Curated annotation (Swiss-Prot):
One of its GO terms (molecular function) is serine-type endopeptidase inhibitor activity. Keywords: Antibiotic, Antimicrobial, Fungicide, Protease inhibitor, Serine protease inhibitor. GO terms for biological process: defense response to fungus; defense response to Gram-negative bacterium; killing of cells of another organism; negative regulation of endopeptidase activity. This is Kunitz-type trypsin inhibitor IVTI. It comes from Inga vera (River koko). Disulfide bonds: none annotated.
Length: 29
């Protein structure tokens, strides 16, 4: 699951980091 704040900043989610729904970072595809 991708979690972003209202500004699209990276948030921790399940130990993974996401920059945008289309660009998972940390191997969270």
């Amino acid at each position: 699951e991708v979690v972003l704040d209202s500004d699209g900043e990276m948030l921790r989610n399940g130990g993974k980091y996401y920059l945008s729904p289309a660009s998972p970072i940390g191997g969270g595809a």
